[in-house]
Amino acid sequence: MGAALTILVDLIEGLAEVSTLTGLSAEAILSGEALAALDGEITALTLEGVMSSETALATMGISEEVYGFVSTVPVFVNRTAGAIWLMQTVQGASTISLGIQRYLHNEEVPTVNRNMALIPWRDPALLDIYFPGVNQFAHALNVVHDWGHGLLHSVGRYVWQMVVQETQHRLEGAVRELTVRQTHTFLDGLARLLENTRWVVSNAPQSAIDAINRGASSASSGYSSLSDYYRQLGLNPPQRRALFNRIEGSMGNGGPTPAAHIQDESGEVIKFYQAQVVSHQRVTPDWMLPLILGLYGDITPTWATVIEEDGPQKKKRRL
C-alpha cells in the first residue's frame, strides 16, 4: 500500500513539472490528448522530409524524457484503474460470500426474484408504536381512496332519486289540492250568486203573445204616430224645469208615481226571507236547497231515498 502511495505522489509531481515545461494541462496528459497532439505535429514535420523525429522534438522544445513521460502516463493510468476495479470487485465478492455464509447459512433459500432490489425490513407496527393510531388512519384513507368514490356516487344517486320522487309527490299533491280548492271556491261563489240573485216566475207563452199583440197594434197605428210625434216634441228649457219641479214635488209628498217611472214586470218576483235571529246564517228556500247542496257535494235526504230505491236491492239472507 505504501509503494502505491509513493508511485501516486511521484506521478503527481511529474505531471506538475511536465505541465510547467510544455504548457500542457494535467487533464490532457492523463487522458492522452497531449500525446495525440505531439504525435500529430511530429508526423507532419517528418513527412515533409525536412528533419527527423529527434530534430522535430528539439524544434518544439521537448526533450526525449518529457516525450516518454507524456506517452507513458495514459497507459499507466488505464492499467492502474483496471487493477483497482478488479481488486474492488474481488473484495466485494469476497465480502458478499462471507456475509452469505455467516448470516444465511441456516436460513431457507429465498424463492423471490433474484434480481429484485433489496430493502431493509421494517416492522409494520413500528409507526404505530411511535405514533399511536396512525395505522388505523392510513387504513381508513386507503378504504376511502379505493371504494369511497363508488360509495359517494351510489349514495348521491340514491339521495337524488329520493329528492325527485318526493318533489314529484309534493307537486302532485299541491296541484290536486289547488284544483280542489279552486273548484270549491268556484262552486261556493256560484251558490252564493244563486242565493242572492233576483228570481222571477214568468209565463213565457203569455209574454210572447203580448209582445206579438203590441207589435200588431204599433203597425196599425203608423199614421197616428205622426200626430203623436208633434205632440211629444221636446219642451223648451223653462217648460222642462217647471215639469221637473212638479214631478219632484209630487214624489216627495207621497203623491202618485208618474207613468214614466212605472216598470212593467215580466213575471212574479220571488221574495226571500232572512233568518229571524242575528247569527249571520245563510238562508235558502226549500225549492233551491237541492241545487245548493248539490253544488257543495251533499245529498239531501230525499235524493238519498231516491238513490236507495233506484239502486240495486240487497238480497236477503236465507235462514
Curated annotation (Swiss-Prot):
It comes from the Viruses. It comes from Murine polyomavirus (strain Crawford small-plaque) (MPyV). Signal peptide: none annotated. GO terms for cellular component: host cell; host cell endoplasmic reticulum membrane; host cell nucleus; membrane; viral capsid. The chain crosses the membrane at residues 287-307. This is Minor capsid protein VP2. Belongs to the polyomaviruses capsid protein VP2 family. A motif (Nuclear localization signal) lies at residues 311-319. Disulfide bonds: none annotated.
